[in-house]
A protein has these predicted regions:
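Non-transmembrane, aqueous-exposed alpha-helical and coiled segments at domain scale
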Residues: 1-349
């Protein structure tokens, strides 16, 4: 394997027992043998998401143990931003949205590894040759016709969720899927892997080596996704407490789009939270701090899914189907979908 990416590093999700496990591994002198990165934490790097002293201390223990193991503590769920995985290379990643992204859009090979297995694989330099590390295991098993048109970020997420709910498992082969930008590709990958066990889809004309996959496909199932299906997933929304972007982490283009839309309107009535990677945050420079004057809170290394900060809200509007799935389950907060343009409008309603 060339790289590893470790999930389950938020104190909210692994607690003291998880911290002790990482500290034990570090105490043995173990070190990762390949370039290894880490998922988001419960605490952001700039202190935007205020948390208790207990969470702060626990997250510090986890970060120190990871560093002792040689992990690059990137605290990002989008390692594909800075790891340019090549087709037909092997990786041990444990964040499902990232696995789906590199499998689908780069034909880099990773199975859905549990966080501890990815870490142990990083130390050993090897992982078990499970199905998605073989061409046989990557054979498409279902035909999916997408009759929706170019997919924006919300539509791409809904399509991913619908495929996941209808198929559940296997490898879908998509015809007619068109993603309008990078954010839509991210949201599709995140939703597909959130609403099913699938972490790989072959997109005709997009996935590297898609013709080879089509040649070996055994398409036992067949489904269609229409514009009416997508419309049926939407519902009327109320007034949110906050608007949230960045699940998965927003890239620099998305952050700049948000800031541009807000600057046109002036200070937002309701706060807009944007989670991104430390690398993108650094690129933004003074823009991140200046955004506070517009009621836009940009933070790095954490997200509203894995931070207890989220529990202070009652209603969140977002264009992320992954956030819609996880936040109610982890925090008991209502989350509803909106296209990103509509999400901006809701911040001024």
């Amino acid at each position: 394997m060339e790289t590893a990416h470790v999930s389950g590093v938020s104190y909210l999700t692994i607690g003291d027992y998880g911290a002790e496990f990482l500290e034990f591994l570090a105490s043995t002198g173990a070190k990762v043998s390949v370039f290894t990165t880490s998922n988001p934490a419960a605490v952001d790097l700039g202190g935007v998401l205020t948390v208790s002293d207990e969470v702060l201390r626990g997250q510090g223990r986890i970060a120190r143990a990871l560093r002792a193991l040689g992990v690059s503590v990137t605290f990002s769920c989008a390692p594909y931003d800075f790891i340019l995985t090549r087709p037909r290379t092997f990786h041990a990643w444990a964040e499902s949205n990232a696995i789906t992204y590199i499998n689908t859009f780069r034909d880099a090979w990773s199975d859905k590894n549990p966080g501890p297995l990815a870490l142990l694989g990083a130390i050993a330099g090897f992982v078990p040759r499970t199905s998605l590390y073989t061409l046989e295991g990557r054979r498409p098993t279902a035909s999916v016709k997408i009759d929706v048109g170019p997919l924006d970020s919300l539509e791409a997420g809904i399509v991913g969720a619908l495929i996941g709910e209808r198929l559940g498992s296997g490898v879908p082969y998509l015809r007619g899927a068109s993603f309008i930008d990078e954010e839509s590709r991210r949201e599709f990958a995140a939703a597909l892997s959130t609403y099913s066990s699938m972490v790989f889809a072959v997109v005709e004309g997009v996935t590297p080596n898609w013709r080879e996959y089509l040649a070996v496909a055994e398409l036992r199932d067949k489904i269609e996704i229409s514009r009416d299906d997508v419309a049926g997933y939407l519902k009327d929304v109320g007034e949110p407490d906050v608007v949230y972007f960045g699940c998965p982490f927003a890239d620099v283009d998305t952050v700049l789009w948000i800031l541009g839309e807000v600057k046109k309107r002036g200070r937002a009535k309701r706060p807009i939270y944007v989670s991104t990677s430390p690398g993108v945050y650094k690129q933004l420079g003074d823009l991140a701090k200046a955004a506070l004057d517009l009621n836009v809170h940009i933070f790095a290394g954490a997200c509203l899914v894995v931070s207890p900060f989220t529990r202070r809200f009652k209603h969140i509007a977002t264009n992320s189907l992954k956030a819609i799935f996880y936040i109610p389950r982890l925090h008991g907060v209502e989350v509803f979908p909106c296209r990103r343009e509509r999400c901006i409008e809701l911040a001024y309603a």
